[in-house]
Curated annotation (Swiss-Prot):
GO terms for cellular component: cytosol. Pfam families: CsrA. InterPro entries: CsrA (IPR003751), CsrA_sf (IPR036107). SUPFAM superfamilies: CsrA-like. The gene is csrA. Belongs to the CsrA/RsmA family. It comes from the Bacteria. A translational regulator that binds mRNA to regulate translation initiation and/or mRNA stability. Usually binds in the 5'-UTR at or near the Shine-Dalgarno sequence preventing ribosome-binding, thus repressing translation. Its main target seems to be the major flagellin gene, while its function is anatagonized by FliW. Keywords: Bacterial flagellum biogenesis, Cytoplasm, Repressor, RNA-binding, Translation regulation. This is Translational regulator CsrA. GO terms for molecular function: mRNA 5'-UTR binding. Homodimer; the beta-strands of each monomer intercalate to form a hydrophobic core, while the alpha-helices form wings that extend away from the core. It comes from Brachyspira hyodysenteriae (strain ATCC 49526 / WA1).
Length: 82
């Protein structure tokens, strides 16, 4: 893990198009500003972990019967790939 020190209004750059700026410090909390392209998904870690958990649970609910129904629908709707 890379650890950097920054002061308020200083930033770091990731790649060519992501900038993370330290906006404010109050007590034990900091505020970050993130400039990134709209196609880059940005989540707080606890939100991301919840999304992963829900996706995992949803995938467990996809039974073989449901997958077969979906497969048949796609084949009938779009035809088999040549």
């Amino acid at each position: 893990m890379l650890v950097l020190s920054r002061k308020i209004n200083q930033s770091i750059v990731i790649g060519d198009n992501i900038e993370i700026m330290l906006v404010d410090i109050r007590g034990d909390q900091i505020k970050l500003g993130i400039n990134a392209p709209k196609n880059v998904k940005i989540f707080r870690k606890e939100v991301y972990e919840e999304i992963e958990s829900q996706n995992l649970e949803a995938s467990k609910e996809a039974t073989a019967d449901k997958l077969n129904i979906l497969s048949n629908f796609v084949k009938n709707k779009f035809g088999k790939k040549q």
